[in-house]
Structures are given as structure tokens and as C-alpha cells.
């Protein structure tokens, strides 16, 4: 089993991270090789509004013509990435920020012409990640990628899943502001994709948790061994390195 763990932190969480989160990263780093992938949706939306550019999404993906891609790149690879790197370093964690363009890290296939510069991960070149980790740095990845010398926006969840699959990671951890999946007020500690589908159909999982668990299932189908959904505002890592939250694993007949 691989000793890599990929942590995905959504853009809406970045300004809420506290000392507990960084202590958990330190605990993970004692057991595993850690990679962090971040989003940046709220900051991108705010910057687009300042530039008088419409925010449009289709099927959960940001419509990204050239002028939007310029803003996405500026925010994700610039202010958002460096803010997280600086925060990690403030907590005595050695971090290096980079994007999916660096070292040909994230190579993408365009999704469709209708939504512009949006890509799906086609191939992950892991050499840069492994090199940084071998020098005891935490790679902090902005989810943009390349295709034919053009830069593309990537959904941060699928970017994290692609990286985790390429590294044969032990675990992909989604940082959220809730404890995990709740059923009748109680935390569901372990589940699989069949039970997740049942939960959605029966209204147990609703609202913003649906895309999180769908991303977890997609990650498993890409080859990730297990996915945990945890509350980044609380201590989500046990001393053993196990996560406190909802852990989703493969069912017996997952495709």
C-alpha cells in the first residue's frame, strides 16, 4: 500500500483553516507523504465580479472562455496558492506551491468547446511531486492543467482524485465544514458507493454533501483506495493516522 495521502481543500474552506487543521497535517506527515490540492471558487467569483465578467456554470463546471481563464489562472496559481503556502509555512510546515502546468503535472483533455478552457485529467506526471516530497516539502497544487500549450481549468475534486490515483495514494481526504455524512443525526463512519447511492435516493444525503460524495465515488472509480470526508475545523486525524469522519471505500462490484 502506498504511503501517499492527498488532501483536497475547497476554496470556501481556505479562509476558515485554523491551528487544528495544520496540526492535523503535521500528524499526517508523520505517517505519510502529503500532497495538498486546493480550490478557489469564491475568490474567482469575486475577482470576476470586480472585472464585470459573468459567472456561469453548467453541470457543476465553470464556463471558462479565455477572459475567464485568465482570471482563474491569476487567482488559483497566484493569490490563493501563495496564501495557503504562507499559512502552512507559518505553522512550520515546509511547502512549495505549484500548478498543474508545472513539470507537465496535470495533462488534460478538453471537456467540450461549449464550456471553453475546462479540462479533465488525462495523465499525471508525478516526477515533480515525488521530487518535492523527497526533499521533505508538501506540494500545494493549484488545479489548472495543460493541453497543446494551452492552460485549462480543472475541477479541484477531480484534479485531487487524478493525483491520488496516479500516486496510488492510501487515501484522498476531502476537507469540509461538516463532520461527514450524517444518518438520523449520527455520523456514518464507514460506507461504500452502493450505500451512498441509496442515501442520495432516500434523501439522507442532500444539498452540498451530494457533490462531495459523488466526487468520492468518482475517485474510487479512478483507482483511489479510500476517500474520507472530514471536518477541517476539528481534529480529524487520530494518532494512528486514521481519519475521523466518513470513509468511503470500494464496493464489491464497482466498475
From Swiss-Prot:
Sorted UniProt keywords: Amino-acid biosynthesis, Arginine biosynthesis, ATP-binding, Cytoplasm, Kinase, Nucleotide-binding, Transferase
Subcellular localization(s) per the UniProt record: Cytoplasm
Residues reported in the UniProt entry to bind substrate: 40-41, 62, 153
GO MF: acetylglutamate kinase activity; ATP binding
Catalytic activity: N-acetyl-L-glutamate + ATP = N-acetyl-L-glutamyl 5-phosphate + ADP
Pathway(s) it belongs to: Amino-acid biosynthesis; L-arginine biosynthesis; N(2)-acetyl-L-ornithine from L-glutamate: step 2/4
Site entry (Transition state stabilizer), positions: 8, 212
Record keyword Nucleotide-binding present: yes
Its EC number(s): 2.7.2.8
Top EC class, one word: transferase
Domain of life: Bacteria
A matching Pfam family: AA_kinase
Cellular-component GO terms for this entry: cytoplasm
GO biological process: arginine biosynthetic process via ornithine; L-arginine biosynthetic process
Similarity comment text for this entry: Belongs to the acetylglutamate kinase family. ArgB subfamily.
HAMAP family: ArgB
NCBIfam families: argB
Function noted in UniProt: Catalyzes the ATP-dependent phosphorylation of N-acetyl-L-glutamate.
Protein name listed in UniProt: Acetylglutamate kinase
Gene name as annotated: argB
Amino acid at each position: 500500500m502506498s504511503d501517499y495521502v492527498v488532501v483536497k481543500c475547497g476554496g470556501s474552506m481556505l479562509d476558515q483553516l485554523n491551528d487544528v487543521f495544520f496540526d492535523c497535517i503535521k500528524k499526517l506527515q508523520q505517517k505519510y507523504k502529503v500532497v495538498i490540492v486546493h480550490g478557489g471558487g469564491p475568490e474567482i467569483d469575486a475577482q470576476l465580479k470586480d472585472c464585470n465578467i459573468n459567472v456561469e456554470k453548467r453541470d457543476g463546471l465553470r464556463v471558462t472562455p479565455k477572459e475567464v481563464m485568465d482570471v482563474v489562472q491569476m487567482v488559483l496559481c497566484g493569490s490563493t496558492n501563495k496564501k495557503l503556502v504562507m499559512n502552512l509555512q507559518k505553522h512550520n510546515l515546509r511547502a512549495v506551491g505549484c500548478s498543474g502546468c508545472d513539470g507537465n503535472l496535470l495533462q488534460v483533455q478538453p471537456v467540450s468547446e461549449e464550456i471553453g478552457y475546462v479540462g479533465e485529467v488525462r495523465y499525471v506526471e508525478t516526477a515533480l511531486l515525488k521530487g518535492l516530497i523527497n526533499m521533505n516539502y508538501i506540494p500545494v497544487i493549484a488545479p489548472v492543467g495543460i493541453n497543446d500549450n494551452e492552460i485549462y481549468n480543472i475541477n479541484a475534486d477531480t484534479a485531487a482524485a487524478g493525483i491520488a490515483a496516479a500516486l496510488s495514494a492510501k487515501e484522498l481526504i476531502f476537507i469540509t465544514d461538516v463532520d461527514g455524512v450524517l444518518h438520523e443525526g449520527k455520523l456514518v463512519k464507514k460506507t461504500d458507493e452502493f450505500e451512498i447511492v441509496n442515501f442520495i435516493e432516500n434523501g439522507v444525503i442532500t444539498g452540498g454533501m451530494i457533490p462531495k460524495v459523488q466526487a468520492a465515488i468518482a475517485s474510487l472509480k479512478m483507482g483511489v483506495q479510500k476517500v474520507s470526508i472530514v471536518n477541517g475545523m476539528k481534529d480529524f486525524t487520530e494518532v494512528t493516522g486514521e481519519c475521523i469522519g466518513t470513509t468511503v471505500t470500494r464496493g464489491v462490484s464497482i466498475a
